[in-house]
Amino acid sequence: MIMGMSFVSVWVLNQDSAKEFYTKKLGCALTNDLKLDNGMRWLTVRPQGSTGQELLLMDPAHSMLDGPTAEQVRALVAKGALSPGVMATSDCRGDHAALSALGVEFVQEPAVRPYGVEAVIRDDSGNWFSFTQRHG
């Protein structure tokens, strides 16, 4: 029986740069950085203190995708056309200030929504994530 999600794949353009961004700027914990026999790098992070789902930072060129498909994915990532998901926060405005000071690009400033306060960031590859502080 499925019990939940373990990993969510996030396509990145450069795994070294992504590792730096997610650990140094977003403050995620590095959980794995392994070279597999097939040449793929298994690079995972998750929020500090979390024991749940991890982000698998994947380079399309070193995945199970064929060459042309990997190039299409890279182009979509670089264009900022992909949104891997929503990150939860307890203080959207405070995180906005702290992350902005670290050079994280915000494509949407914190704004009140029916479900909470939301801001949107773009990672160093072009992916965008919603940062959401839910009401109550």
Task: State the predicted function of each range.
Residues 12-16:
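Short acidic-aromatic low-complexity motifs
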Residues 18-23, 99, 126:
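Conserved active-site tyrosine of GNAT-family acetyltransferases
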Residues 1-7, 29-88, 93-124, 132-136:
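Vicinal oxygen chelate
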Residues 17-18, 94:
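Short Gly/charged-rich anion-binding patches and loops
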